[in-house]
């Protein structure tokens, strides 16, 4: 067993903290590098293997960059508001503030035991009034700019959690947290106008160093489509409605239209005979999430309203249906159905026996099956017959425009960001309601609007804040008369939409941040976290950055220049870790047994960083053996250096061979670590230690050279095993700290060997390997191969037909 243990971890953690080794100085020499891992929620289950896989390897990358001369800023904090703490309070009676503070203290302790070089002096905790004061300031600034507004909207409502759910939080019609069936409810809510930035949010994606899949997900989520808006009038009434379509060329093929169940027009047009069926259908639709309703594989459902629309070009009557695959929040909440040229419309028409009218044929006139969804030539379309799809789009919109019934239109899938939550444990929305003045924003001088501690958590559909008279009743900042506070709190994604801006200036009491400092420090150079945040946190942070830029606070467009998603660490059974499956891994247990560096190195060697994989106890044991072997070999080398016996000063064959491995490893580890390919970097370190072990068995050694090699090995190892490497560096007699050392530089000349090993084949089978001078020409290599004793024996009595030389690699002798 080696000497490395948690005692060594503690020794160096204390020394690093005492000496302020990692304290960030923005004025220090070196190019700024802002490295950020997504901060975590301080849950009761504390730090798990997934947290470690995010934080440990990225800390190693940051250490590597620090040694390369970068001025690294790597802060840490906690995304501390949210539903779990409130649900815990309902269940146990423990106040969210108390449970959260306790969990943060434990997780800080665990993160420090990791030995990461986090800048703790820059910590942010989103539930502290010192932080959420500025979250409220952000709300007020967005409100001033018309980017925060209030409206009534249908929302996903969980009757059990008694709160609004985002579409992403509804799975198979149920709440993802408690599995209760979700319903729809009309509530007056606060929204942020993210749609004002839809074009820029989409257009700037291609300039980011982000995973392709995440970029694609955001593009799809924003969903820009260019098309036309067409107006349909309702038969026998003054009512009308618009539909958005990207295929206005198929307008003459419309055989019915479909309204979203939530479209207010439904109640105005439904016939007496169809009213009951329509009402029942609307109730069923409330139980489905928007994501489920749009599923391609799900069978389409619908019901006839009894009303008809008038086709804008033909004047024919078209039946109006209600269908839940149409969303009130997308486009106009109404679609025109062309079953001959759309798969979804075709399935719906076949199911309900509705007309299917072909209006597009293939360009080459060939017979095509329906639905035919390609571009082509118009037929059965009156004056537009014979036009191509593109020509018809122009001509039909021209005609509709002249009639006042249509126009070109750009539409987005992206909806405004709903930020109201009917919960307690979040930042209060800084607004009061006055009978005289209406909606009145709280003045900045009165921030923060603090959460009251004494509240009732019974889940009854009311925000706990609404039940606190001391909180609710206030005076209007404008007229001084009695007023009531807003009792909803902000979505926790608002807190995390700007936290990266607060870190560098977290002690500022006069402003959320100093723009001069932030514009030097930002954007974040490397951001690491899970891919599940692609369409929420990552999109919201981009929006907030752009909004603050336009207000004059920031001079950059994007918050995160480069983004990496770590993979998922699974249980030993290959399944996602969960307490119910009994397959969770507690880092603390393994750290007690092996030390933090072995745990870290196993995560970095055992898995490709962006992929992850199944945990293996055998894997961590093998990494522990590797660390013990390094210690033994370095002990041997250190003892030889200390004794000073059998020393030589020349660089002979053995020294050149070790020097080759040294520089080969420096190059490989540098390249791989830079790309976060930690597993292959550590594999190179294993090869290097083999070469070092072999050299320490030489009878005579160049001890100055050996010390240089061991020092370089420890420098390369330091980011991956920081405590162990610091200890070995110290034992070698070097000055504190290894992390103040420069990263080793690779010498290309060292990779040019005096001699190279050549394999010799006879008729394609390897018979021997020989060493030849690396600058030997082809004829010389041939001669050396043919003169080798084993080759002479293998070719005896045979005729050499030809000799093929691949320089630096092999010789193949063909005989018969």
Swiss-Prot record:
Which UniProt keywords are present, listed alphabetically?
Answer: Aminoacyl-tRNA synthetase, ATP-binding, Cytoplasm, Ligase, Nucleotide-binding, Protein biosynthesis
Residue ranges for motif 'KMSKS' region? 576-580
What is its subcellular localisation?
Cytoplasm
| Span of the annotated motif 'HIGH' region | 40-51
Q: Which GO terms fall under molecular function for this chain's record?
A: aminoacyl-tRNA deacylase activity; ATP binding; leucine-tRNA ligase activity
Q: What class of enzyme is it?
A: ligase
Q: Which InterPro entries match?
A: aa-tRNA-synth_Ia, Leu-tRNA-ligase, Leu_tRNA-synth_edit, M/V/L/I-tRNA-synth_anticd-bd, Methionyl/Leucyl_tRNA_Synth, Rossmann-like_a/b/a_fold, tRNAsynth_Ia_anticodon-bd, Val/Leu/Ile-tRNA-synth_edit
- What is the catalytic activity of this protein? tRNA(Leu) + L-leucine + ATP = L-leucyl-tRNA(Leu) + AMP + diphosphate
Family, per the entry? Belongs to the class-I aminoacyl-tRNA synthetase family.
Query: Which named protein is this?
Result: Leucine--tRNA ligase
């Amino acid at each position: 067993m080696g000497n490395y243990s948690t005692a060594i971890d503690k020794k160096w953690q204390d020394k690093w903290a005492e000496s302020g080794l990692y304290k960030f100085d923005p004025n220090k020499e070196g190019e700024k590098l802002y490295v950020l891992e997504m901060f975590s929620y301080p849950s009761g289950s504390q730090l798990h293997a997934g947290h470690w896989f995010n934080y440990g390897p990225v800390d190693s990358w940051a250490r590597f960059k620090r040694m390369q001369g970068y001025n690294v800023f790597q802060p840490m904090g906690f995304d501390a508001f949210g539903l779990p703490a409130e649900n815990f309070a309902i269940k146990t009676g423990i106040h969210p503030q108390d449970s959260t503070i306790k969990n943060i203290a434990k997780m800080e302790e665990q993160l420090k035991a990791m030995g990461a070089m986090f800048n703790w002096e820059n910590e942010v905790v989103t539930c502290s009034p010192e932080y959420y004061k500025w979250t409220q300031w952000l709300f007020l600034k967005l409100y001033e700019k018309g980017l925060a507004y209030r409206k009534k909207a249908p929302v996903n409502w969980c009757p059990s959690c008694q709160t609004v759910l985002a579409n992403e939080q509804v799975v198979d019609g149920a709440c993802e947290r408690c599995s209760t069936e979700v319903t729809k409810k009309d509530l007056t809510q606060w929204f942020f106008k993210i749609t004002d930035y839809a074009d820029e949010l989409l257009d700037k994606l291609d300039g980011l160093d982000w995973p392709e899949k995440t970029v694609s997900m955001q593009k799809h989520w924003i969903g820009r489509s260019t098309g036309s808006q067409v107006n349909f009038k309702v038969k026998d009434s003054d009512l009308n409605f618009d539909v958005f379509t990207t295929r206005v060329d198929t307008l003459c093929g419309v055989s019915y239209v479909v309204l979203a169940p939530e479209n207010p027009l439904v109640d105005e047009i439904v016939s007496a005979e169809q009213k009951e069926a329509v009402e029942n259908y609307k109730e069923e639709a409330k139980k489905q999430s928007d994501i489920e309703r749009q599923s391609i594989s799900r069978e389409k459902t619908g019901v006839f309203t009894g009303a008809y629309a008038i086709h804008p070009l033909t004047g024919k009557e078209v039946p109006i249906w209600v269908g839940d695959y149409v969303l009130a929040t997308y486009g106009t909440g109404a679609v025109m159905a062309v079953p001959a040229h759309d798969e979804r419309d075709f399935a719906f028409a076949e199911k309900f026996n509705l007309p299917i009218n072909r209006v597009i044929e293939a360009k080459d006139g060939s017979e095509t099956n329906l639905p035919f969804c390609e571009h082509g030539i118009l037929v059965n379309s009156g004056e537009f017959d014979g036009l191509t799809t593109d020509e018809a789009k122009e001509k039909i919109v021209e005609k509709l425009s002249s009639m006042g019934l249509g126009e070109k239109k750009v539409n987005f899938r992206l909806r405004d960001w709903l930020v109201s939550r009917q919960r307690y444990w979040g930042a209060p929305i800084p607004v009061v309601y006055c009978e005289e003045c209406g909606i009145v924003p709280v003045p900045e001088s009165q921030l923060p609007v603090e959460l009251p501690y004494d509240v009732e958590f019974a889940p009854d559909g009311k925000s706990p804040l609404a039940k606190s008279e001391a909180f609710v009743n206030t005076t209007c900042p404008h007229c001084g008369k009695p007023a009531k506070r807003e009792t909803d709190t902000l979505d926790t994604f608002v807190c995390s939409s700007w936290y990266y801006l607060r870190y560098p200036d977290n002690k500022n009491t006069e402003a959320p941040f100093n723009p001069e400092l932030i514009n030097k420090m930002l954007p974040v150079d490397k951001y690491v976290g899970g891919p599940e945040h692609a369409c929420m946190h990552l999109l919201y942070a981009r929006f907030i950055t752009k909004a603050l830029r336009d207000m004059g606070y920031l001079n950059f467009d994007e918050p995160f220049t480069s983004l990496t998603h770590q993979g998922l660490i699974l249980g030993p059974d290959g399944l996602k870790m969960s307490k119910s499956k009994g397959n969770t891994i507690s880092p603390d247990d393994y750290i007690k047994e092996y030390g933090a560096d072995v745990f870290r190195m196993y995560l970095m060697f055992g898995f490709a960083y962006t992929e992850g994989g199944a945990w293996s106890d055998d894997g961590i044991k093998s990494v522990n053996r590797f660390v013990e072997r390094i210690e033994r070999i370095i002990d041997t080398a250190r003892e030889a250096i200390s004794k000073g016996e059998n020393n030589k000063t020349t660089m002979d064959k053995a020294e050149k061979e070790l020097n080759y491995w040294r520089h080969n490893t420096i190059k490989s580890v540098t390249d791989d670590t830079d790309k976060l390919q930690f597993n292959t970097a550590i594999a190179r370190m294993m090869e290097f230690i083999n070469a070092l072990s072999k050299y320490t068995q030489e009878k005579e050694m160049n001890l100055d050279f050996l010390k240089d090699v061991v020092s370089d090995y420890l420098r390369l190892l330091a980011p991956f095993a920081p405590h162990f490497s610091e200890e070995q560096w110290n034992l070698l007699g070097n000055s504190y700290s290894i992390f103040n050392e420069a990263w080793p530089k690779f010498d290309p000349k060292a990779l040019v060997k005096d001699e190279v090993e050549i394999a010799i084949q006879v008729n394609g089978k390897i018979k021997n390997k020989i060493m030849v001078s690396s600058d030997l020409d082809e004829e010389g290599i041939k001669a050396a191969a043919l003169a080798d004793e084993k080759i002479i024996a293998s070719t005896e009595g045979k005729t050499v037909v030809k000799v093929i030389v691949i320089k630096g690699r092999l010789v193949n002798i063909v005989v018969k």
